[in-house]
C-alpha cells in the first residue's frame, strides 16, 4: 500500500507516527524539514496536525538534510523526512556530513507497507529486485543507530534510536513503513530516560590526582574545539577558564565556542598556519589542556600541530588522558570540572596574558577602491552584532572569517571536515528557523550557492530576513589556487545574482551588487537598517584573490589534499 486510504488528519486513533512526533517534541524539536512523497504522506498529515511540531517543506531532499543539520547545531536535536529510495538517497550527503560533524539528526524515511515488501514486488523507488533493505544497509555507514520499524516493537525502537542520537550527537535512521506509521499504539508512559552518564569515581579520582601533579604551579593554557559544544560542556569549560588567568584558543572548527573578545583569548590555532603568537602560546605552553579537540587536515594546517603529549591533558567525550595515561570511563564535563577545582584549590594566581602590541589596522579604503578579500571580511566583521548566527561556506568565506574576532554572542557555523560546498545556504535556513529571533548572516561563494540556491524562496515563505553575501569571484577560486588557474573546469556560468531572489519567489528583499568598497559599505549599512527584509549582497572580487590563511594552507598542498570552492 503506497497511497492514502483515509484522511489521517481526522483519525482520532493515536499511532506510531504520533508517538515518534511526541518523542521528538520532548527533545525540543518544533519543526521538521523534508519533502513529501507518497510513502510518507499520511505521516505528514500527522505532522501538520501535531500541536507542537510544524512542517517546513524544502525544495529538495539534500537541502532538507542540510537545513536539519543547521537546525540541529543550534537546538541539539532535529529531524528530516524523506521518501523511500529516491528521497532518502538524495539526502545521504547531508546525513553523512552530520555524522562527520557530530550533529544529531533523526532521518525518517517513509517506506512501502510491510505486506508489499513481503511480497517482494518491484515497487517504484526500489531497485526492482524485491530487496527493500538496500538503503537501510547504506544508512548503517553514516548513522549511529538504525531501525526498520515493526508494529510490535516500533515504540521501543524509536526510543532506542532517538536516545542513541541524543547520546552520540550523530544521525539516526528510522524506516517508517506506511502501515507501521498508522499502527495504533499508546502515548509515551514516561519521559525518555536521562543521559546514561559514564564516569567512574575511581577514574575521576585517578585523573584528578594525575592532572594536579602535572599542573603543579604552572599556568594552564587551553585549546578547545567543537566537541565541547556538541556535548553541552560549555559551562564547565567556562568555569575552568574563570578559575584562574587561563590563556585559551580554539580551532577553526570550534570558532565562537568561546568569547573572542576576552583578554585571555589568544585566537585561532591552525598548526603551522597559525599567527605566530598563537602558535607559540599553544605549542610552548608549560601545561596544555585540549578539550574536545579533533585535529582534521583543514583546521590543523594539514596536521602541522606540534603538541607535546608529555605536557598535555587531553579531555575527550568519554575518556581523558594526562601525559598519555588514559582514564576511562570519564565524561568531558566531569573532567573539566576536576581541572577547574584543581586551579581553584591551589591558591595561585597566574600572571596576566601577555598581549602583543596591537598592529595598526588597515586604513579605511577609498570608496571607489575595487573590492578585495581583506576589505570584504574586515567590513563584514564590523557589521556583525551580538546574537548573529554566521554561516560561512567552505572556501574563501570560511577562511576569510576564521582569523577575524567575532563580537560576544555571535555563533559561527562552518563545515570544515565534511566540506560539502553549498551546505551553508540550506543550513542557514535551518538555523534561522531554529532561532528566528537571531538574525542569520550567510557568507557563500558563487559556485557553492549555485548548488543549493533553490532554498532562497523558503526563507521568504517562512518570514525570515537573513543577510546573504554571495562572494562572486567568477568560479572556483580555491581550486584555481591549488591547480588549474586558468582551466575551464574551474569556471562556472555567470548568474545575475541580484535577479535570483525574485525569480525564486522571495517577496520582501533588497538585492545589491558591490564592486567597490563604497558599494559594500552602503549595502551593509542598508542591511543593518532593513532588519525585516532579506538582504542579498553580491560582492564582486578578483578571481585569484584569496584570504591570507587560505593562501598559507594552499601553499603547502598537493591538489588531492585540499577541498572547498569559491
UniProtKB/Swiss-Prot annotation:
Binding site for thiamine diphosphate: 61
Gene Ontology CC annotations of this record: cytosol
Keyword Lyase: yes
Sorted UniProt keywords: Decarboxylase, Lyase, Magnesium, Metal-binding, Thiamine pyrophosphate
Cofactor note: Binds 1 metal ion per subunit.
Example GO biological process: aromatic amino acid family catabolic process to alcohol via Ehrlich pathway
Molecular function in Gene Ontology: magnesium ion binding; pyruvate decarboxylase activity; thiamine pyrophosphate binding
Binding residues for Mg(2+): 446, 473, 475
InterPro entries associated with the record: DHS-like_NAD/FAD-binding_dom, PDC/IPDC-like, THDP-binding, Thiamin_PyroP_enz_cen_dom, Thiamin_PyroP_enz_TPP-bd_dom, TPP-bd_CS, TPP_enzyme_TPP-bd, TPP_PDC_IPDC
Names of the cofactor(s): a metal cation; thiamine diphosphate
Keyword Lyase set for record: yes
Domain of life (superkingdom): Bacteria
Function, as annotated: Decarboxylates branched-chain and aromatic alpha-keto acids to aldehydes.
Protein name, entry field: Alpha-keto-acid decarboxylase
Originating organism: Mycobacterium ulcerans (strain Agy99)
Gene coding for it: kdc
Amino acid at each position: 500500500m503506497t497511497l492514502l486510504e483515509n484522511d489521517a488528519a481526522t483519525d482520532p486513533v493515536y499511532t506510531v507516527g504520533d508517538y515518534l512526533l511526541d518523542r521528538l517534541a520532548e527533545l525540543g524539536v518544533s519543526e521538521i524539514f523534508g519533502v513529501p512523497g507518497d510513502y510518507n504522506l499520511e505521516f505528514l498529515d500527522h505532522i501538520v496536525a501535531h500541536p507542537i511540531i510544524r512542517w517546513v517543506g524544502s525544495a529538495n531532499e539534500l537541502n532538507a538534510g542540510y537545513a536539519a543539520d543547521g537546525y540541529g547545531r543550534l537546538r541539539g536535536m532535529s529531524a528530516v523526512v524523506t521518501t523511500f529510495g529516491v528521497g532518502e538517497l538524495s539526502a545521504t550527503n547531508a546525513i553523512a556530513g552530520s555524522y562527520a560533524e557530530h550533529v544529531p539528526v533523526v532521518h525518517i524515511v517513509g517506506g512501502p507497507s510491510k505486506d508489499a515488501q513481503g511480497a517482494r514486488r518491484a515497487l517504484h523507488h526500489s531497485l526492482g529486485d524485491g530487496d527493500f533493505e538496500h538503503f537501510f544497509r547504506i544508512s548503517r555507514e553514516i548513522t549511529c543507530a538504525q531501525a526498520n520499524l515493526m508494529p510490535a516493537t516500533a515504540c521501543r525502537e524509536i526510543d532506542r534510536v532517538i536516545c542513541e542520537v541524543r547520546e552520540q550527537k550523530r544521525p539516526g535512521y528510522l524506516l517508517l513503513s506506511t502501515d507501521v506509521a498508522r499502527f495504533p499504539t499508546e502515548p509515551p508512559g514516561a519521559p525518555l530516560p536521562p543521559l546514561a552518564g559514564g564516569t567512574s569515581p575511581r577514574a575521576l579520582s585517578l585523573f584528578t590526582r594525575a592532572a594536579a601533579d602535572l599542573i603543579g604551579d604552572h599556568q594552564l593554557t587551553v585549546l578547545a574545539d567543537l566537541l565541547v559544544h556538541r556535548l553541552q560542556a560549555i559551562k564547565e569549560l567556562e568555569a575552568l577558564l574563570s578559575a584562574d588567568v587561563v590563556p585559551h584558543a580554539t580551532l577553526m572548527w570550534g570558532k565562537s565556542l568561546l568569547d573572542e573578545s576576552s583578554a585571555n583569548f589568544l585566537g585561532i590555532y591552525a598548526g603551522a598556519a597559525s599567527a605566530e603568537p598563537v602558535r607559540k602560546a599553544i605549542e610552548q605552553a608549560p601545561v596544555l589542556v585540549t578539550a574536545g579537540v579533533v585535529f582534521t587536515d583543514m583546521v590543523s594546517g594539514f596536521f602541522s600541530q606540534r603538541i607535546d603529549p608529555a605536557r598535555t591533558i587531553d579531555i575527550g567525550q568519554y575518556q581523558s588522558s594526562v601525559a598519555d595515561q588514559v582514564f576511562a570511563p570519564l565524561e568531558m564535563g566531569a573532567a573539566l570540572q576536576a581541572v577547574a577545582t584543581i586551579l581553584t584549590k591551589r591558591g595561585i594566581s597566574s600572571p596576566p596574558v601577555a598581549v602583543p602590541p596591537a598592529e595598526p589596522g588597515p586604513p579605511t579604503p577609498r570608496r571607489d577602491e575595487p573590492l578585495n578579500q581583506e576589505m570584504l571580511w574586515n567590513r563584514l566583521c564590523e557589521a556583525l552584532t551580538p546574537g548573529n548566527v554566521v554561516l560561512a561556506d567552505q572556501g574563501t568565506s570560511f577562511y576569510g572569517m576564521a582569523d577575524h574576532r567575532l563580537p560576544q554572542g555571535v555563533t559561527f557555523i562552518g563545515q570544515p571536515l565534511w566540506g560539502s560546498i553549498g551546505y551553508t545556504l540550506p543550513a542557514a535556513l535551518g538555523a534561522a528557523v531554529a532561532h528566528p529571533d537571531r538574525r542569520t548572516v550567510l557568507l557563500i561563494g558563487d559556485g557553492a550557492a549555485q548548488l543549493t540556491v533553490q532554498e532562497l524562496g523558503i526563507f521568504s515563505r517562512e518570514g525570515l530576513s537573513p543577510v546573504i553575501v554571495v562572494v562572486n569571484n567568477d568560479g572556483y577560486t580555491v581550486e584555481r589556487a591549488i591547480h588549474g588557474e586558468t582551466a575551464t573546469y574551474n569556471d562556472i556560468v555567470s548568474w545575475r545574482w541580484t535577479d535570483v531572489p525574485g525569480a525564486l519567489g522571495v517577496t520582501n528583499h533588497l538585492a545589491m551588487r558591490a564592486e567597490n568598497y563604497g558599494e559594500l559599505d552602503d549595502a551593509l549599512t542598508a542591511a543593518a537598517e532593513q532588519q525585516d527584509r532579506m538582504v542579498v549582497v553580491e560582492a564582486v572580487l578578483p578571481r585569484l584573490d584569496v584570504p591570507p590563511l587560505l593562501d598559507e594552507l594552499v601553499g603547502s598542498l598537493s591538489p588531492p589534499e585540499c577541498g572547498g570552492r569559491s
